[in-house]
């Protein structure tokens, strides 16, 4: 059974870590089902503090990816890819947002710059399974924060070299580990980042 036609072009799915009947879905908006997919409702709008038709920085949504973590089952994380016109050019960028207590907050905003640029196919996002504040996402490179409450998002990989290859398609943390490594599927294969390794190191 498919969901309402309004919700077509779904690209992201995630189950709530502590409730197998609750499913999140994303495409150009974000949705929730609390009954195993029988009915769906939006998780955005003014009542949630995140209006997809009026995003900060005038970004127009292209695609959204989502993820969850067992470290904070009530949280939903979103990677919102968009575009905007700047100086007669179309520039890609993204917001990273967290839904908690029925309210979204944007924790990171970034626009394409140099070799760090966005595309529809490079939209990986992952959160540590043991630390809900360790958030990482990727485009051509890995970007992240080891603690979103105190550490600004920054580059966590080179463009190419030193164990890493550009253009990231997937990010997955090791499960059932006290200090999990981050695995990265990219155009060069699979790269692995160990922690703690700030900045571009650890690959």
Where are these regions (language model features)?
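Beta-propeller blade termini and top-face loops
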Residues: 1-203
